[in-house]
Amino acid sequence: MPKYVEGIELTQEGMHAIFERMGHPNITSGTIYNGEPTIDKGALDRQGFMPVLTGVSPRQDSGHWIMLIKGQGNQYFLFDPLGESSGKYYQNILAKKLPGATLSVIPNNAGLNMGLCGYWVASVGLRAHAALTQPIPPSLRNLGQTITQEMRDELTQDGSEKITQWLRAVGNEFPDGDIQPDATALRRATEKNVRIDEFQPVLTGTSPKEISINPTAPQEVSVPTWNGFSLYTDETVRNAARYAYDNYLGKPYTGTVEATPVNFGGQMVYRQHHGLAHTLRTMAYAEIIVEEARKAKLRGESLKTFADGRTLADVTPEELRKIMIAQAFFVTGRDDEESSKNYEKYHEQSRDAFLKYVEENKSTLIPDVFKDEKDVKFYADVIEDKDHKWADSPAHVLVNQGHMVDLVRVKQPPESYLEYYFSQLQPWIGSTATEAVFATQRQFFHATYEAVAGFDSENKEPHLVVDGLGRYVIGQDGNPIREESDDEDEEESGELKFFSQKKKLEENQRYMRVDEYLKLDEVQKRFPGAGKKLDGGLPGLKEYQYLQRLNSINRARCENDVDFCLGQLQTAHHQTKITPIKRAFQSSSEKARRQPNMDEIAAARIVQQIMANPDCIHDDHVFLNGQKLEEKFFRDLLAKCDMAIVGSLLNDTDIRNIDTLMQHERNTEFHSTDAKAKPVKLGETWEKTIRSGGGVTQIKHDLIFLMQNDAWYHTRVNAIAQNRDKDSTFKEVLITALMTPLTNKSLMDTSRSPAPKTLFRGLDLSEEFKNKLINQAETIIANTTEHLFTDLSTEAFKQIKLNDFSQVSARTCASTSTNIEVPRTIFGSNTIFEILDPDGLLHPKQVGTHVSGSESEYSIYLPEDVALVPIKVSFDGKTGKGKDRHIFTLVAVKSPDFTPRHESGYAVGPLLKMQTPKLEEIQRLVEQAREEPDLERVFNLQSRVARQAKFSTESGYKTFLNEKVAPVLEQSLNGLLDNNVTILGKVLSAFPSDGQWSAFNSVEARQMKIQMDAIKQMVEKKAVLEGQILPALAQCQNALEKQNIAGALQALRNIPSEKEMQTMLSISGGLRGQIQRAKQDLTETLEPLQRAITAKLVSDQEKVKVRYEKLIAGIPQQIADLEKAELADLAKVKKVVSRFNHLQEELKLLRNEKIRMHTGSEKVDFSDIAQLEAQLQKIHTKLYDAYLVELTKEISALVKEKPKNLADVKRMVSNFYAMSADIEQLRQEKIKEHGESKDPIDMSDIDKLKEELQKINQFLVKAMGTNIRVSLNQMEVKTFDAQEKEAQQNLKQLDALINKLESSDAVQKQKEELEKLNQLLVEKRKAYPAMVQLQFRSEALIIHLRELCEAHQAQMAKTRNVRAQEITNGRWKVQWLTDWVGLTTDERVTLANKEKELAKFKEDLNNDEYDLQELISNLAEKNPSELEEAIGISKESAQKLHKLLTHLNHSTTFMSKIEQRLQSIDELLNEFGKQAPRTEMIKTVEEKQGTLLRL
């Protein structure tokens, strides 16, 4: 409950807090208690004003606020928000505390209080004080008018509702900020900074929708959610441990046995065996044992019960707290280690230490921890352990078992003790849980630097029978000696015979060894340690290192420092929750995000191209480079890509392009997932509201701001990203796919803060969905437990995979905070994820400090190979709206097992297809550049060369032409004639170089060179374009069509480089540039794809294989159990259906695992799974038929029910919804049964059930509407808040019921009725301030009646005394005789009886035990004459009072009646003010006495 506001009124603490917030710290307020004022006049004079709370009583902490104001000199003023007439009733009361002073009432008008008197005192009251302390104060009349007008002004335009909402919003804390002069200014300055929950009538068709997640956790068993209590965080328990240490455990022993102190690392330890560390470990075991018992119950195991039917799984947090306090003192009474002789004495002393602690801390322990002295005595008896009742109660078991679990460290042989203690704990919590306790025990020993013993089931030492410290014996025949069996027909042997260690063995007898004992059948059945071995010490440490550790300073700190020791245990305890989870999965040592795969690289490239060219965006698709990308493509990107990885591939140019994109999408509408919210124009809002100027860094901050703060945007984006959206437009899906990676990039670029290890995420979920999450979490937690001998990792793997908890936070930028109060208080979330990231796997990014107060805000995009696994669920009280709040503690774990196996190519395929137009365009240009060779020119040149060679006189030139030029021309001609580009390519290198030509300077030689260069360019152009570029382009295109990235890149490498093509003058510079740009663009697109890494799904092949074999091995037995399952009623049928569906999910998991293990190219063999699926399918028909029969019975029974009240109706509604869900489940089962058949599905049987349920629905709508109307008319002031919340819930439930109706006419009619009920609730809310005002006026009436009664009866007492004395003086001596015979009457008896009667009336009227309504009810039972006589009012006034009391005795919410009653109170109080105390009754007595005397 809020501490500052009760209903809509400020409490005393709230009044002090609001004045402190306004700059008036430590004010003193006054009270009027039962009509008696408590006023500190000195404080009033110092402060200048004093709020006074009236109507206070032992039964009521709040009341009506008024204000005393110190004026000039000895002048005081009274301000009453109810008005002048109400203030005058308090004037006389308060004047008694201001002797000699003048107290005036400010004449403000009535009817404006609206139940907000505390607020008015802190607002207009303070302003009145300021006015009255001016050098020239206003007249009271003017001040009254000013106050009246100010109150009227503030109440206009639903002012009362606004004030009420603000008061409720600040009910726990007033927002920080500048000092304000009064409450009005404070409200207006802080309204925008507080979360105001506006009243919303229930609109038809707006019932909450849940997220479509179907957990597979069985719904059969549950335990109450833990409230978060823990040894490590509870100060009460910690203080008890400190007290025990300071006064006992930290003191030297006074005895002699093993009492010598030990020096560990320079610190003395006085009690190394039964000291602080031992005590704290036993307390930690208690917590572990209860945790594991709860897990065992959730697993469906049967546990040993106590006399009251409870088990250790039913221990409450409050009970465990008391048990731990008792454990803190369990060994405090020891004088030394001689416990066997002094057990009774030591435990008596421990009990006395406990009792002494409780007595010294009684004020904080009783009744807050222990209910009473009887409760304390019970725990004292547990400590004393007088009768060794170790199984009587949870306290007995936990205290004694905790002690025993810790004893293993000092007992030999350890195998014997471990087996015995295991057998003692096992019945209470089961074998699996017992293993977990002893596994945790070893971790606790490590954590507190205690020695950890080994366990060897092959130990040849004699076995010790712990219970009695005896032995078992192997007889002469080599078999164990046993007791004779009592049952002659029993085939099994008797129990092992116990022998004292003092008994002398006979010849050929010997003690049974440890290994022999552990191999016995009866031991192996109950103890899983047979054939197992556990190493002692600490893994990784050599013996001498381990001994150093055991004698270190930290060992001493664990014995001497409560906080240090608890910290060590807490760390170990926490690790035992995480280790089983990690053990169940393939390990991953890499903490960083994985490298991008091909599709993520392709996605980034596509995002970049769209951002750079927003004109490619159309209303229902994107048309990019010839490819039409529709909604499914972008949904695939969101569902299959890690968008944080995609974001890491983007650059600042892409960020800058956001402004361009937003301009293009200026009028694109974005819709919040809230159906009532108006759509927002994306680009326009970005430009006008979000963007605040600045460069690329500011764009990043603005994008983050948009994602974090604008619900119209982030609710839709998150819903689309997680594929749980409805009615999204293509543009909204596209924007989500573009902005999600860009937001991640912005977060990565702007975050500079170190990554926190703990984050909190708040969600507001429907109760139904939250309960499913709780069920999922508890199923996972129950199956992830530490083990000592038995490997449970396969079951843990299965439950975590089947109940994936990560999807709630996956695929989107999830907002989190390092401060739990952000989701808890600021946002009022009913679900909080406490996310632990000890290994730094989540890479949270600080949102940025662009908004003040956002420094604690972080965003996480969950890596796809990281899962959030629950390790704890805690109840965390109520939200501001009265909902239960739960905290889910999750740990981040990384493994290839969490990486989904997507079919690749969903993004690469479209990207590669986009490259085809580029290739085709280059091919077109190259084709255009091709020319037919000029063969005639070659012929002519050949002839010319032949002539010059023949007639040349220079022998060198002649030789050059014949050997270098002529062959090249011949080869070129052949190549051109045959169109053989290969020959032409080779010929190119044979053309004479410029150096060779330079040796000949003749005119003929120079002309010949020019001609040869022209031929060379002709050959070169054909050889390069047709022999290299066109084939390379064709090869590249062919490779891209086959998604052969390497082949495409190799083809691109076959295109000459830019440097090579610079010398190819035969090809135009423009074409060369186009070719090189296309090559570069294609290479830049394809090379990153070639470097992409495919995530490795299997890092430990053997582990995955063994896990699969274990999973599939358990399925046949589960199927056999289903075949034999009992189907006697609906509950049992549903239980079996749930198990059936769960088994189907297990088979799906097995299919996924088989795919994960598959590495070859051949088809996966699913034959083993298919065989199991076929077996399962045979069971389904029988299940469906049984489900239909039992559901029909239940619906028929519901039709016949006749509810008597709203509770009955709501119970029927609950059954109605359950049956609606059953019908839907039945429909799904029918679809499953139909399978892949092409025949139409016959749903007639289900349709009949739906018709019957519709009749129930119609009846419930009418019944609920009627009952809601009645309850609304019966709302009362004291319970208004609770009744209002209940009414809102009922109206929501009615709305949901109406929406279930199938007839449109019926729906419309009932929605009209719902609207009327909504309006009626609004009217009651409006009437509430008047109801509060009526209560205050009723209190004033009672106070005035008390004053009248007091004055009247005081006057009557005087008159009676005088009259009684007169009668006594006037009696003669023997008148007693005439009285006795009846001739006269002694009227003193009558006077005395009347005095008693009136005194009883006065006592009841002033009884503090009654609340206001009880007082009114008692007075209403009196008749008018009794009221007249007892209070001293006129007959007419008594009749009016009786009538008024009769009305007030019945509460009302109707304004007309409230106003009528307020008017009657005012009229009566005015009449009372004019009447003087009456003494008619005394006069009547006098006359009667006189008459009797005359007789």
Curated annotation (Swiss-Prot):
Following inactivation of the gene, the phenotype reported is: Cells lacking all four members of the SidE family (SdeA, SdeB, SdeC and SidE) show no intracellular growth defect in mouse bone marrow macrophages (BMM), but display attenuated growth inside the protozoan hosts A.castellanii and D.discoideum. This mutant no longer recruits the endoplasmic reticulum (ER) marker GFP-HDEL to its vacuoles, even at 10 hours post infection, and is unable to induce RAB33B ubiquitination during infection.
Recorded catalytic reaction(s): these are:
L-arginyl-[protein] + NAD(+) = N(omega)-(ADP-D-ribosyl)-L-arginyl-[protein] + nicotinamide + H(+)
The entry's comment on post-translational modification says:
Glutamylated by SidJ; glutamylation inhibits sidE activity to catalyze the production of ADP-ribosylated ubiquitin.
Signal peptide (from-to): none
User: Does the entry feature the keyword Transferase, yes or no?
Assistant: yes
Question: Where are the compositionally biased (Acidic residues) regions?
Answer: 484-493
Biological process according to GO = protein deubiquitination; proteolysis
* UniProt keyword annotations, A-Z: Glycosyltransferase, Hydrolase, Isopeptide bond, Multifunctional enzyme, NAD, Nucleotide-binding, Nucleotidyltransferase, Protease, Thiol protease, Transferase, Ubl conjugation pathway, Virulence
| EC identifiers of the protein | 3.4.22.-, 2.3.2.-, 2.4.2.31
User: Where do the catalytic residues lie?
Assistant: H64 (for deubiquitinase activity), D80 (for deubiquitinase activity), C117 (nucleophile)
Checking InterPro entries in the record gives: SidE_DUB, SidE_mART, SidE_PDE
Q: Which family does it belong to?
A: Belongs to the SidE family.
SUBUNIT field: Homodimer.
Q: What is this protein called?
A: Ubiquitinating enzyme SidE
Q: What is the lineage of its organism?
A: Bacteria, Pseudomonadati, Pseudomonadota, Gammaproteobacteria, Legionellales
Q: What's the gene?
A: sidE
